[in-house]
Swiss-Prot record:
Fe cation binds at residues 210, 212, 268. One of its GO terms (molecular function) is metal ion binding. One of its GO terms (cellular component) is cytosol. 2-oxoglutarate binds at residue 278. Belongs to the iron/ascorbate-dependent oxidoreductase family. This is Homoarginine-6-hydroxylase 2-ODD-C23.1. Disruption phenotype: Plants missing 2ODDC23.1, 2ODDC23.2 and 2ODDC23.3 produce reduced guanidine content. 2-oxoglutarate-dependent dioxygenase catalyzing homoarginine 6-hydroxylation thus producing 6-hydroxy-L-homoarginine. Guanidine (Gd) is in turn synthesized by the spontaneous conversion of 6-hydroxy-L-homoarginine to (S)-2-amino-6-oxohexanoate (RHEA:79843); guanidine is a nitrogen-rich compound that can serve as a defense or signaling substance. Optimum pH is 7.2. Inactive below pH 5 and above pH 9. InterPro entries: DIOX_N (IPR026992), IPNS-like_FE2OG_OXY (IPR044861), IPNS-like_sf (IPR027443), Iron_ascorbate_oxido_reductase (IPR050231), Oxoglu/Fe-dep_dioxygenase_dom (IPR005123).
Length: 332
């Protein structure tokens, strides 16, 4: 459960990345400091910034800028990669087609998923099968995004080794059958600028309050517009003020289950009060698509009944969880 945090912690993970493939990483003093910070952030807020992550600021900025270029294209051009159920819920959706808790969100987006070969997961994966839809314009869009996905996948794996150390004393709990073949989701999102009445923004909800589905999210947001908000225990909405070159990270529903409720999948939302268009690229690192997710044995031993002794977490199959969300998220 989140605390009454008033800001999100900033964690320099450079030492963790340096030692993350060392079998003796747990004995390194610098790694231990990072692990302690990750543990506290996941318990207190479920959100944190990472710096020292090794992905260049130039790449981070290019990903947002080419996304912005796509959203500036004529509507008819964007519709060439229109999302449909037949396309595996991959592609472009116009403003209002994404729905959170029954309410249309004020954003447009491209949704991409790790591609699933026909029949790989049987009935559970059938609705998600198919290739991603990449636009022909801007040029180099697909090439840049595929490279960015590789970078984010590797970074997420390394951060989760640190979180695994914090939870279980071993860096490898989120590999193998759990996340050795991780699924991923990427959403490229554009939020229109706010309309103003009597000098005040209208406060349209760019994305309604929700939690994320999987293990870990990396948020690449515009440097000059504050819009992402995280709810603390007291019900206050705390702004995730942009820090250039950083990622905002948060944990998802699957990690909450694995931790037996020790780590929080925290409610968050987006309200773009700026008159300018805002771009955000969110990368979601997930378990294996067919992973059966339940509290880790060591978490059941250390934290029986969940945090505070009152929470019970049943097992979930990640792919079923994702499909149930995806099939109700869009008004098409």
């Amino acid at each position: 459960m989140a605390t009454d945090f008033k800001s999100l912690p900033v964690i320099d993970i450079s030492r963790l990345l340096l030692k993350c493939d060392d079998p003796d990483m747990a004995e390194d003093v610098g790694v231990a400091e990072v692990v302690q910070q990750l543990d506290k952030a996941c318990r207190d807020a479920g959100f944190f910034y990472v710096i020292g992550h090794g992905i260049s600021e130039d790449v981070i900025n290019k990903v947002r800028e080419i996304t912005r270029e796509f959203f500036k294209l004529p509507y008819e051009e964007k519709l060439k990669i229109k999302m449909t159920p037949a396309a595996g819920y991959r592609g472009y959706q116009r403003i209002g087609e994404n729905v959170t808790k029954g309410i249309p969100d004020i954003h447009e987006a491209i949704d991409c998923y790790r591609e699933i070969k026909q029949g790989k997961y049987g009935d559970i994966g059938k609705v998600m099968e198919g290739p991603n839809q990449w636009p022909e314009n801007p040029q180099e869009f697909k090439e840049l995004m595929e490279e960015y996905i590789k970078l984010c996948t590797d970074l997420s794996r390394k951060i989760l080794r640190g979180i695994s150390l914090a939870l279980a004393g071993s860096p490898y709990e989120f590999e193998g059958k759990m996340a050795g073949d991780p699924f991923w989701v990427m959403r490229l999102i554009g939020y229109p600028g706010a309309e103003f009445t009597n000098g005040q923004p209208e406060n349209d909800i760019g994305c309604g309050a929700h939690t994320d589905y999987g293990l870990l999210t990396l948020v690449n947001q515009d440097d000059d517009k504050t819009a992402l908000q995280v709810r603390n225990l007291g019900g206050e909405w705390i702004s995730a003020i942009p820090i250039p070159g950083s990622f905002v990270c948060n944990i998802g529903d699957m990690l909450k289950i694995l931790s037996n409720g020790v780590y929080e999948s925290t409610l968050h939302r987006v309200i773009n009060n700026s008159p300018q268009y805002r771009v955000c690229v969110a990368f979601f690192y997930e378990t294996n698509f067919d992973a059966v997710v339940e509290p880790l044995d060591i978490c059941k031993q250390k934290y029986p009944g969940g945090r505070g002794g009152c929470q019970v977490f049943k097992r979930a199959v990640y792919g079923e969880h994702l499909v149930s969300k995806v099939q109700t998220n869009f008004a098409m």
